[in-house]
Amino acid sequence: WALPLGLLVGTLLALGSVAAVWSLAGWIGRSRSHAGRIESVAALGDAGTEAPIEVICAMPPSWGGHRPGQFVFVRFEGTEGAHPFTIASAPHALGNSPKGEPLLRLVIKPLGDYTRTLPQRLHAGQRVDIEGPYGRFDGKGSRRRQQVWVAAGVGVTPFLALLEARQPGLSTGRSDSTPAHMHYCTRDARRDPLLARLQALCAQAVPPVPLAVYSEAQGQRLTPQDLEAAPGPLDIWFCGPQGLGDALHEHARGPSPWRLHRESFVMR
């Protein structure tokens, strides 16, 4: 241990121990933690237990706001540890609660054991602990590249926030006005509870965002060639299941002039 290598190993072990204690004590992210309140909970659509829920959260004064496309770690009162969810609203889009608290929207789809229990366990007035925001899935790209947005299933949530930020009166900067094309993959367009809102946001955006919908129930599937219909080099922004993301990643490694930005669904 007296040798330089031993001193280095000892220092690294000490730093690792401190980091482990810091993590186990729950101090990571503490400066970004906010105790909010559920303002409302509502089921979207008529898909029964498979319907996503919209959770509106009222945030405390410590909340410093967010950028479109960011996510947060959420721990609902009486449930297990924190889970990541994308903020599905643009900054200031929902205004404030009657108490003057800033509001944000979460759209949660029942994809697993935990999320399937939330419709029965969440209610207005309940405490919610939110850590964040995190991430840079902001749709900012070069004006020399065509912006192409690709969403599948609940992966549409960051794009709802990006599109909401492009609505009249909410646009805040150069990145909001960069022309983009939207591609949305869904199991069944006829029963998709988020599609109507997506269509309205695309149509009313400034500038409008052309939307292509691929409904699996109608035999429609997205291919890389569909994305390459846009001329020139592409900035591809993708959020959705890992399989489709991997396919796009493999294609982006080829000769196509793609730059792929990908929001991961595998983080826990």
Which residue ranges define each predicted feature?
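Anionic-ligand-binding alpha/beta catalytic cores of soluble enzymes and soluble regulatory domains
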Residues: W1-H34, R166
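Reductase modules of NAD(P)H-dependent flavoproteins
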Residues: W1-S17, D113-Q120, P179-R268
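Ferredoxin-reductase
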Residues: W22-D129, D138, Q147, P179, ...
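Short, conserved phosphate/pyrophosphate- and ester-handling motifs at nucleotide-, phospho-/glycolipid
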Residues: G69, G155, G240-P241
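Short, solvent-exposed amphipathic alpha-helical segments in soluble enzyme
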Residues: V72-R75, H123-A124, E164-G169, R197-L201, ...
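Short helix-loop-beta connector
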Residues: G141-R145, P231-G232
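Conserved beta-strand elements of the Class I
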Residues: Q146-V150, D235-W237
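Histidine-anchored nucleotide/phosphate-binding helix
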Residues: V156-G173
